[in-house]
């Protein structure tokens, strides 16, 4: 069985002690996809949804969520994020929106969860704002694509 840093020697859950780690610049990038009907995508892009500008609202929600990750995920450390960015890439040929979230910090622990949370909440916000028009939307394949900084170095997800 792999060693899990969130478990102590007795198997109890703990928050990882990062006090001996060096402060380094860290970055994480996550992506996800939201599939929908072509009419729904067109309405989002035309800013014709009844609840307003869907993508800008989702961008703000994703940024806010990244800043609150430590309040949502029990063993995450509170971080002084230096940058959070959420971008949207509409794909008309697949009737979907690719969501990319990026988080940066100069700190002792990584920002993977913050990037993943930004993408997740941005996707949920789009779903919430458009569900009256398209209940069949699907949030898909939210995953980490890149991270660097810290002891483990760089990770690039080729898949």
Curated annotation (Swiss-Prot):
Task: Respond yes or no to whether keyword Lyase is given for this record.
Answer: yes
Its EC top class is lyase
Q: Where do the catalytic residues lie?
A: 128
Q: Which reaction does it catalyse?
A: (8S)-3',8-cyclo-7,8-dihydroguanosine 5'-triphosphate = cyclic pyranopterin phosphate + diphosphate
**What keywords does the record list, in alphabetical order?**
Lyase, Molybdenum cofactor biosynthesis
Q: Which GO terms describe its molecular function?
A: cyclic pyranopterin monophosphate synthase activity
Reported EC number(s) for this entry are: 4.6.1.17
What's an example GO BP annotation here? Mo-molybdopterin cofactor biosynthetic process
State the pathway, as annotated in the record.
Cofactor biosynthesis; molybdopterin biosynthesis
For this protein, the record's InterPro entries field holds: MoaC, MoaC_bact/euk, MoaC_sf, MoCo_biosynth_MoaA/MoaC, Mopterin_CF_biosynth-C_dom
Task: Please tell me whether the keyword Acyltransferase is annotated for this protein.
Answer: no
- Which residues are recorded as binding substrate? 75-77, 113-114
Gene3D superfamilies for the chain: Molybdopterin cofactor biosynthesis C (MoaC) domain
Relate the assembly described in the record: Homohexamer; trimer of dimers.
Database matches in PANTHER family: CYCLIC PYRANOPTERIN MONOPHOSPHATE SYNTHASE, MOLYBDOPTERIN COFACTOR SYNTHESIS PROTEIN A
Q: Which family does it belong to?
A: Belongs to the MoaC family.
Function summary:
Catalyzes the conversion of (8S)-3',8-cyclo-7,8-dihydroguanosine 5'-triphosphate to cyclic pyranopterin monophosphate (cPMP).
Query: By what name is this protein known?
Result: Cyclic pyranopterin monophosphate synthase
Organism field: Desulfatibacillum aliphaticivorans
Q: What is the name of the gene encoding this protein?
A: moaC
């Amino acid at each position: 069985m792999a060693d899990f840093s969130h478990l102590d020697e007795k198997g109890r859950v703990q928050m990882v002690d990062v006090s001996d780690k060096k402060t380094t610049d860290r970055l994480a990038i996550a992506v996800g996809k939201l599939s929908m009907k072509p009419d729904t995508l067109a309405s989002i892009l035309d800013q014709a949804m009844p609840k307003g500008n869907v993508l800008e609202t989702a961008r703000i929600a994703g940024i806010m969520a990244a800043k609150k990750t430590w309040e949502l995920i029990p063993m995450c450390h509170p971080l002084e994020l230096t940058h959070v960015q959420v971008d949207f890439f509409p794909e008309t040929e697949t009737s979907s929106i690719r969501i990319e979230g990026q988080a940066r910090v100069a700190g002792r622990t990584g920002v993977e969860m913050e990037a993943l949370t930004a993408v997740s909440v941005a996707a949920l916000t789009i779903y919430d704002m458009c569900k009256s028009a398209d209940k069949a939307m699907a949030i898909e394949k939210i995953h980490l694509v890149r991270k660097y900084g810290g002891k483990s170095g760089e990770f690039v997800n080729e898949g």
